[in-house]
Amino acid sequence: MGRKKIQIQRITDERNRQVTFTKRKFGLMKKAYELSVLCDCEIALIIFNHSNKLFQYASTDMDKVLLKYTEYNEPHESRTNADIIETLRKKGFNGCDSPEPDGDDSIDQSPLMEDKYRKSSEDLDILFKRYGSAVPAPNFAMPVTVPVTNQNALHFSNPGGSLITQSLMTSSLTDPRLLSPPQPSLQRNTVSPGLPQRPASAGAMLGGELNNSNGTCPSPVGNGYISARASPGLLPVSNGNSLGKVIQAKSPPSPNQNSQLGANSRKPDLRVITSQGGKGLMHHLTEEQLEMSVQRLGGVSQATHSLTTPVVSVATPSLLSHHGLPFSAMSTAYNTDYQLTSADLASLSTFSSPGSLSLGNVTAWQHQQQQQQQHNQPQQLIPVSLSNLVSSSHLPHTATLTVNTNPINISIKREPASPNRERSTGTPLSCFSHQSRHEATGRSPVDSLSSNASSFEGNDREDPRGDYTSSLGLLRPSGDTESESQSVKRMRLDAWVT
């Protein structure tokens, strides 16, 4: 790459003239030095600038060179500007233009440096041709190192269509140097055998993805990872087990897995299971999975669409109502004899807000429950405090809701405290404020009753809080007349302020 040509004429700009003088003066002295060394000669330069300032250069000593000059009387070569211009014309140069030199003229334009630059450019071109265009395709397989306890159950799927092979996954997992602790912001779904499986992500439960029977959920993110915000199942639980669980849609857990739920396994990461077009989702979930799913309902819902599996709660402790924060506390255990059906879920969808809880909705729901249970066992009536569903400012202490239920031996436990989180208002799940703490004392056994809509076993429950007490009271047998039951229910529901 050549240097630009400049016109050889007087520079009018003072600053440019000074810069050019400094550069070319040093270049001239450098050329004189090279000539004196290469050819073993004595050189003296005497320069006066436009302001009559003297600059001189001598290869040895200026006085000695000047003395030899004054004493020399032999004919010699003497040139002026006109002679130089004439010589340049004869050699083919224009005489009016010259390359713009710089201070390091000889170093920059030496053949050695040009060869070095040319070789470096060729090496860079080879590297760019070899690696420059190697852009990874969208559908590529990459080894993923995640800490797991069961290598046979891992089979990740890429939305692009490529699958990670089992041998590649096994080789990556067996190398102890590749295993790293799970990060809170970016993790894979892992499977832990022997533990109850829970939904790994609210986004991974959508549509036809429930038909996977290999125990995994496809990743909703393009690169195969699931962020911690979109995958609540990957957050570590309080008992130290940081492995996330994935749901198995069509294979319910065995009874021994149900019995392994310890009383100290509290789930601080509560989420909502959402489904778009997932018909009959509750049919594939057993009671234990419903328990774990419902316990995760205290956090903010990650989806903005309506839920197709609404569940109503009749058992919530009034521990956090003084903050004025509504959260959904669902009944967290179900017996296998009283699994909810799609008709139950359709009727439960009316319990979306306190304003939509009317007498007709409750009567329709109770009538449907009576039709399903009239051929099994005698019915019993349990009065449940409505102050657990709505705030105390809308309902007297003595107002109760009569719920038809079917168990014979009822074991009522206390509901553990849920995290202090808010629910989004766009979901039809029950989001009711809890009553204040001062109402827990001085109430009748009817008001302090906190029961679930279906019976559950005591070994599947978590440890209750020590500062909260609940009592069972006023269990009336089903031998009472139907008219008395209806009149009592209407009288109690009249106090419900909607």
UniProtKB/Swiss-Prot annotation:
PROSITE patterns in alphabetical order: MADS_BOX_1, MADS_BOX_2
One GO molecular-function entry: DNA-binding transcription factor activity, RNA polymerase II-specific
Interaction with hdac9: annotated span: 1-100
An annotated GO cellular component: nucleus
One Pfam family per UniProt: SRF-TF
Tissue expr: Restricted to the somitic mesoderm of early embryos and to the body muscle (myotomes) of the tadpole. Expressed in all tissues examined in the adult.
Domain MADS-box: 3-57
GO biological process per UniProt: cell differentiation; heart development; positive regulation of transcription by RNA polymerase II
Compositionally biased tracts (Polar residues): 425-434, 447-457
Compartment(s) where it occurs, according to its Swiss-Prot or TrEMBL record: Nucleus
Keyword check for Cell membrane: no
Disulfide bonds: none
Record region (Disordered): 173-215, 243-267, 411-498
Role this protein plays: May regulate muscle-specific transcription in the embryo and may regulate transcription of a variety of cell types in the adult. It binds to the sequence 5'-CTA[TA]4TAR-3'.
Assembly notes: Binds DNA as a multimer, probably as a dimer. Interacts with hdac9.
Stated name of the protein: Myocyte-specific enhancer factor 2D homolog
Organism this protein belongs to: Xenopus laevis
Lineage: Eukaryota, Metazoa, Chordata, Craniata, Vertebrata
